Amino acid sequence: MWEAMNNFTWNPVNLHRFIANIAFGGSVVAAYAAFRFLASAPDSEERAHYDWMGYIGNFIAVCGLIPLPFAGYWLGREIYGYDQQLGITMMGGIFSWLFIIQAVLIGALFLGANYYLWLGMERIPGAERYRRFTPYLLGILTVCFLVWLTPHSLVASLEEARKMGGAHHPLLGVFGVMSAKNTAVNIMILTTFLSFLLYRRGNKGALIPMAQQSTASKVALALITALAVVLLTVLGNPPFLVLIEAAVLVLALALALANRGTWGQGLLFLMSASVVIFYGVYGYFVEAIVRIGFSILQVSSVLVVLVVGTAIDIVIFRGAPLVGDIRWGKIPERAQYILFLLATSFTWLMGLMGYARSGLRTHWHIFNVVRDYSSDAFTPRLGDASLVVSIIVLVFLLLVSFIFWLAHLGTQAHAEEGALLEVAAPVTGGSDAD
């Protein structure tokens, strides 16, 4: 039994579902908080509470969203490893346009998550220092989003295909392959991480010198850097790349210890972006089986920046004076609709990808092992499956909205009961005459 369960996709699917459920759960909590935020009175304590709750829910969702493509890369690599035809069916066959829909939804998730962080800076005193970076971050995200959703082949008439010289556009076709798409999504992850770092340090003042930081913090930072180098080795990076990235990590650590932590973080971002872009371009000149392995090199570089960059940020801003307290409840109301968008996109995306995972088997119970001879052994068309998934998503959201409404009624009834008890409570103590 264990030999049958422990197959190529067992662990990748488990990890992918685990991370996706974290992101999905966080987005639903954030959507509930958004509903309560909009239903509360302005400048009320309740609105401040649900603003905080929405931020926490969105934070959990983003923490799941950022590593989710990494788990997807692993799952895709194992699918190709099990059977290359299965991978071709997934990315270049009948399901290829489904991944264009996936790109649109995930792009909306990244853009929405970043937009929410940028709007959240309006409630943070001192965050106006970093708002000048927002147009550049938005530009990077938009370009990467456009690259990611560009299809490799276009639906075109015979006349249009003749004008293009084939089914592939001479320019846009270059951006339709996985080398470009892997590069784009990794740059989007780095950009989202940078937005979060700017948000996190929004109300932080001057940095505390490293000489005043605890020895334990410095040792922990050094250990995390060393573990990052080990991670690069474990993930199968070639020795020359491990050596280069290890040197950059050590230099970033030295800069952090020399009170230049932000420079060290910038160096890490530059290193990771260079690795991602280099292997994205190099992927055009190698075979597909080699190109698939490049995604791991790109992912490991980004993952190292996420881990070490976060550690440096925590240490260098530890104990820093605050410019002011966060004004919970002062975020613009349009930010709450972003939280609704995130919850809807996550739900729809999970349904569509479930169709892709199940439909990949086509007319097999186990691909190329046990054939399905039943009358229902067919794969629904993308349009039919998308319609069914959309109806299911709508029903799910209506059920969740009904639960939200019931919870709101219960809370409201409890509050009214408490108010009546306060009014009816007898006044104790002596009178003025006494």
Locations of regions flagged by a protein language model:
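Polytopic transmembrane helical bundles with strong interfacial aromatic enrichment
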Residues: 1-434
